[in-house]
Amino acid sequence: MEISTCVKYVGVNDHQVDLFEGQYKVPNGMSYNSYVILDEKIAVMDTVDGFFTEEWLNNVEQVLSGKTPDYLVIQHMEPDHSASIPAFLKKYPKTTVVSTAKGFQFMEQFFPEFFAVQGLPAEQHIVAANDGVLELGQHSLHFVYAPMVHWPEVMMTY
C-alpha cells in the first residue's frame, strides 16, 4: 500500500487473533505494521509476527523491486514486532540493523541460534542514540527513546 511515493506499507493483517496482549478484544483482528522508506538509502521499519514472515517478506520484496535495503530499524522487540528479524537478515544479509542497545541485547537473547551462528558484524549494526538521526537522503529518521512505555528497549522514530 502506498503511503506516499517514498513510503510504502508492507505490514500484514492477522484476522485470527481475537485478543490483543491476551486481554483486549479485537473482533476484526489486528495489523502488524511495517514500512519501507525508499530514498538514496532504503530503510525497512520493523518486522512482523513469525506466523506472517513469508507474507511480509513477499510484501517487502515486491516494494523493493530488486533493490537491497540498507537499514532494518527495530523499534520494539516484542515477538509480534521482531520475530521475522532472522529471516529478513538471511534474505538480506548486508542490511545494517538499527536499534537501541537494549534492543540488541534482546536480539541476542531472543535469537541466540541466529546471532550465535552468523553474528552481526560491528559495521552492520547501529545503536541509535536518543535524539539521534539517520540520514537516508531526502528523509531523515529521528530516534526518541521511550523505555518502559511498553518494554524497556522501545524507541520511536519520526
Labelled PLM ranges:
Residues 17, 77-82, 104-107, 150-151:
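Active-site environment of divalent metal-dependent phosphoester hydrolases
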Residues 2-60, 64, 156:
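Conserved beta-strand hairpin/beta-sheet module of binuclear metal-dependent hydrolase folds
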Residues 40-41, 68-69, 93-94, 121-123, ...:
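Short coil/turn connectors at secondary-structure junctions
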Residues 39, 47, 76, 101, ...:
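Conserved residues at beta->alpha junctions
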Residues 51-99:
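Active-site metal-binding motif and surrounding structural segment of the metallo-beta-lactamase
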Residues 2-5, 99-154:
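Metallo-beta-lactamase
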